[in-house]
């Protein structure tokens, strides 16, 4: 993609309303634009990142045996009355009526809808377990939306829901998602720490938040530093191995970890002083087991092995891809701009032509772009008629993992320059060696 033809409305000045670094950088890098309080348009660069985050989330959900569906955003109020949550949810839920005066709502979550889908189509324990998920836009009318896409009113959410015959089976489904989330965040270049959490309006008696550490995090967290080096299960992890999966979850919940809401100073004091870590953190995922909280009032039942009907045991599991984009920036940036992990960078390579119009530079850049794309790498080619300093500033701001710098001096010696954005390391090499060099690193 040539930058001269791309839609990248970069801002030179930081908008005054942007309070945290991710919001500032997403606006400056032309990733998003605000349309109303807490509501954003995703522009091409931001959408590429968002789609890549969704691809990783989707791949790990599928690996764990979850099945993707898509449910309506506009939901019937009667379903929420049936579960008992219509009045309890409060003003965060946007309520409306259609032309026939039927009461509807803009779904902030989908436990009721997925339970209705399940009960209408599943009758026997032989059809269990099931884990259904979707990736869709949600709306919660926050009193004070702030921090850009970190706490917006409209947001993209992966919400999953499991159905099992009993508590033991439901706990295995919970563990599957627990491990899949560890793998998801690892692939996104994030170290997420699971912490016991309050179940809030979702309900239930078992819940974990997944928290990444960041200086600008919204929550204070307390944990054992052992979490920073714990191994994440590999792609070969067997999600059907009940005991093995429970062992992974036990290992990842054996050390102290709590947000300020759940913090117990006396228990934390038992952690060796050298291992205690107090920091700021950002919630990037939340999982719940809530038993029969929804299935009982909504009569989501199956026939068990003994022939009697029983309500299914359920769990729900959330990751916010739009929030994850901002959280990644909070955890990975410097004074010059964003530093994208390879897995979700909008492009792999920023190709910088230092002298547009120079025959040798133009030809070399065209050949390099073709070679990189043939090797499966995505390239954003800065072919604008701008000063080198402006091009370097743009490349650093948008944070692509690699910068390939082509100028007349280097080409006179048959060389180009390669820079790694994360480390700042530079090297010179022959253009023909470039694709293999990037692939190897």
UniProtKB/Swiss-Prot annotation:
The keyword Protein biosynthesis applies. Belongs to the class-II aminoacyl-tRNA synthetase family. ProS type 2 subfamily. It comes from Methylorubrum extorquens (strain CM4 / NCIMB 13688). It catalyses: tRNA(Pro) + L-proline + ATP = L-prolyl-tRNA(Pro) + AMP + diphosphate. One of its GO terms (biological process) is prolyl-tRNA aminoacylation. Catalyzes the attachment of proline to tRNA(Pro) in a two-step reaction: proline is first activated by ATP to form Pro-AMP and then transferred to the acceptor end of tRNA(Pro). Its EC number is 6.1.1.15. It comes from the Bacteria. It is found in: Cytoplasm. InterPro entries: aa-tRNA-synt_IIb, aa-tRNA-synth_II, aa-tRNA-synth_II/BPL/LPL, Anticodon-bd, Anticodon-bd_dom_sf, Pro-tRNA-ligase_IIa, Pro-tRNA-synth_IIa_bac-type, Pro-tRNA_synthetase. One of its GO terms (molecular function) is ATP binding. Homodimer. GO terms for cellular component: cytosol. Keywords: Aminoacyl-tRNA synthetase, ATP-binding, Cytoplasm, Ligase, Nucleotide-binding, Protein biosynthesis. This is Proline--tRNA ligase. It holds the Pfam family HGTP_anticodon. Its main location: cytoplasm. It is an enzyme of class 6 (ligase).
């Amino acid at each position: 993609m040539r930058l001269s033809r791309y839609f990248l409305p970069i801002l030179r000045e930081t908008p005054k309303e942007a309070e945290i670094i991710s919001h500032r950088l997403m606006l400056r890098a032309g990733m998003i634009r605000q349309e109303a309080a807490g509501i954003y348009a995703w522009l091409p660069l931001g959408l590429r990142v968002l789609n890549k985050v969704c691809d990783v989330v989707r791949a790990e959900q599928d690996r764990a045996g979850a099945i993707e569906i898509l449910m309506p955003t506009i939901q019937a109020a009667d379903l929420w009355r049936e579960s008992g949550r219509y009045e309890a949810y409060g003003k965060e839920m946007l309520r409306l009526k259609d032309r026939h005066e039927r009461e509807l709502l803009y779904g902030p979550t989908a436990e009721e809808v997925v339970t209705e889908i399940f009960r209408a189509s599943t009758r026997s324990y032989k059809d269990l377990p099931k884990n259904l998920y979707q990736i869709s836009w949600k709306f919660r009318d926050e009193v004070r939306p702030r921090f850009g896409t970190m706490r917006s009113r409209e947001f993209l959410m992966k919400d999953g829901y499991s159905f099992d015959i009993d508590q033991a089976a439901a706990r295995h489904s919970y563990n599957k998602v627990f491990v899949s989330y560890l793998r998801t965040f690892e692939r996104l270049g994030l170290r997420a720490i699971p912490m016991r959490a309050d179940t809030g309006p979702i309900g239930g008696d078992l819940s974990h938040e997944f928290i990444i550490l960041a200086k600008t995090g919204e929550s204070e967290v307390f944990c054992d530093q052992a979490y920073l080096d714990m191994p994440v299960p590999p792609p070969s992890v067997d999600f059907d191995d009940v005991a093995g999966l429970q062992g992974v979850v036990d290992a990842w919940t054996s050390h102290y970890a709590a947000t300020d809401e759940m913090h117990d100073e006396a228990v934390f004091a038992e952690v060796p002083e050298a291992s205690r870590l107090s920091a700021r953190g950002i919630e990037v995922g939340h999982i719940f087991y809530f038993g029969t909280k929804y299935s009982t009032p909504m009569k989501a039942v199956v026939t068990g092995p003994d022939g009697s009907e029983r309500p299914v045991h359920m769990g729900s599991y959330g990751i916010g891809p739009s929030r994850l984009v901002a959280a990644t920036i909070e955890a990975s940036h410097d004074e010059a701009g964003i530093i994208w992990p390879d897995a979700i960078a909008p492009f792999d390579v920023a190709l910088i032509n230092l002298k547009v119009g120079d025959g040798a530079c133009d030809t070399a850049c065209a050949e390099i772009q073709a070679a990189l794309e043939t090797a499966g790498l995505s390239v954003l080619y800065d072919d604008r008629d701008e000063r080198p300093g402006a091009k370097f500033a743009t490349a650093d701001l948008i944070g692509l993992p690699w910068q390939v710098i082509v100028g007349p001096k280097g080409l006179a010696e048959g060389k180009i320059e390669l820079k790694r954005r994360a480390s700042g390391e530079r090297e010179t090499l022959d253009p023909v060696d470039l694709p293999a060099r990037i692939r190897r690193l």
